[in-house]
Amino acid sequence: MKKIKIIISTKLFFSSLIFLISFLTLAQRDKLDVNDTKIIKEIFDESLTSRETYKLLDHLCNKIGHRLSGSSSASKAVEWTEMIMSKYNFDKVYKQNLYVPNWKRGEPEVAKIIGQKKELSVLALGMSVSTPKKGITAEVIEVQGIEDVEVLGREKIKGKIVFFNRPTDQRLISTGSAYGGAVDQRTSGPSIAAKYGAIAVVIRSVGTAFDDVPHTGVTRYKEGIKKIPAAALGVKSADRLELALKDNANVKLFIKMNCITLEDAPSHNVIGELMGNEFPD
């Protein structure tokens, strides 16, 4: 048996810890069954039926709270994770130094359809750049995906705010598949839109819920392409913008974002080691 390292980051904490607790519970037996399939099934069964992990998740979410990389809450989560892991039967638990992105949301974002009093529910996408201090006001062009942007081209995209409005496919039983079918608008959409001259991007939140709470995640800017502000609208706010565009194709949107990316911040992976019987080194 070789040495096993289990690395817990707060981003993957829940799923990793399910496996961790299950593995350590089963690993305490003197002799494991040689039938790997049986052992794997036992691990999954333990993961799916144990309530311990949910208690830990409850503490992580409700006692420690948000854990954006580089934040004080993320540091608290690291210390808590090390403490929790030290209670299990690892041979060694330690922290590994690393640096993580340090993005700050800043003052609350504002988005409003020109001519309407009620603001839209909006949040900047993680790692987005900010708008100018006074915000941006521009015409909105609605698209259903990245392909639409490429078809429309620079002539119709330049100087506008691109509204990626493809919804999550509610017909798909697998929510993961539904999410995957729409998330490219968030991750790649802003850079694609910027390539064709867009000055900002708003997206319909990627998710299955019908509410007005924006779902963010991160966007990934491509090298060599200008970074433009990118934000997520709550589903109901996206519906409002969609309806406004049906009534008037020349709708203008005001958006103001105050986010900033600072130098990478120090953080840690938390690592647990189980030494093998045959090859402990």
Positions of the model-derived regions?
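N-terminal capping segment at the start of a domain
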Residues: D36-S71, V213-V218
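Sec/Tat-exported extracytoplasmic proteins
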Residues: S47, C61-L68, T81, Y88-K92, ...
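Soluble metallo-hydrolase cores and metallopeptidase-like ectodomains found primarily
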Residues: T37-I39, I114-R154, T219-D281
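Bacterial N-terminal signal peptides that target proteins for export
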Residues: K2-F14
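Extracytoplasmic/secreted proteins, especially bacterial periplasmic and envelope-associated proteins
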Residues: N35-E42, E52-K55, H59, K76, ...
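Noncatalytic luminal/extracellular "stalk/propeptide" segments of secretory-pathway proteins
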Residues: R29-L32, D58, N62-I173
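Extracellular/luminal Protease-associated
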Residues: L123-P229
